[in-house]
Every structure is written in structure tokens, then in C-alpha cells.
Amino acid sequence: MITVSAETPMEEVIKLCQAQRITRVPVWRLQTGQRRVIGVVTLKTSLYEPDFDPAKQAGDYLQPPLYLPEDLHLESALKRMQRSGQWLAIVTRQDRREVGIVALQDILRVLFGEVGR
């Protein structure tokens, strides 16, 4: 999974997204010596901001992250993601430590199999 620091200029985020053919990137910041995901940058939302500036940092264009516990059933995870409108979620342990990231596409693939484009 590709992530960027909150201090990464949006110009770099855009280039990274183009190179990797992605539209959403989790953003992290060091907190007490550990990387913590603090949000998600979505290109579509960022680029349509009236005051968008590619020199600004990724942290200036964050959407709040959705956290899902690692033991949550997939059907419940799907419902939470649908309600929140998020396409990415941060998976956490009971102690709130981050253990991974799941995309809506991953959940749909597991529940329904591959869907043609």
C-alpha cells in the first residue's frame, strides 16, 4: 500500500497517483515516534477545492480516516464503508494500533468475486 507523509507536497502526491494509477492515498504523521494514519487524500476532492494549491501539503487536504477493528465481519465492514462514503479504511487492533488498510474494492472482491470492468 502506498502512503505519504502529511508534509508531502500535493504536486508529488499527484505525480505518485499518476504513476501508480490510484486516486486515494493514506496520509501519515509521526506521533510518539510511530507512523499514524491521520487521513486520506482523495485526488478528486482535492483537485476540486476552490483554493487548491499543488505546493500545499497533503495534510492540508485530508479527509478523516475510517477505522475498522480487525475482527469485524466483512458484511459489517462493507456497511460501515458505504455509510461513511469512504473507499479506504484503516484496520486496527483492539488497542487501536494500526495493522493494515482495506479498500472497498477488496471487500467486494472477497464477497462477490471478480467483477468485469
Which residue stretches match the model-derived regions?
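Soluble cytosolic regulatory domains appended to membrane proteins
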Residues: M1-R117
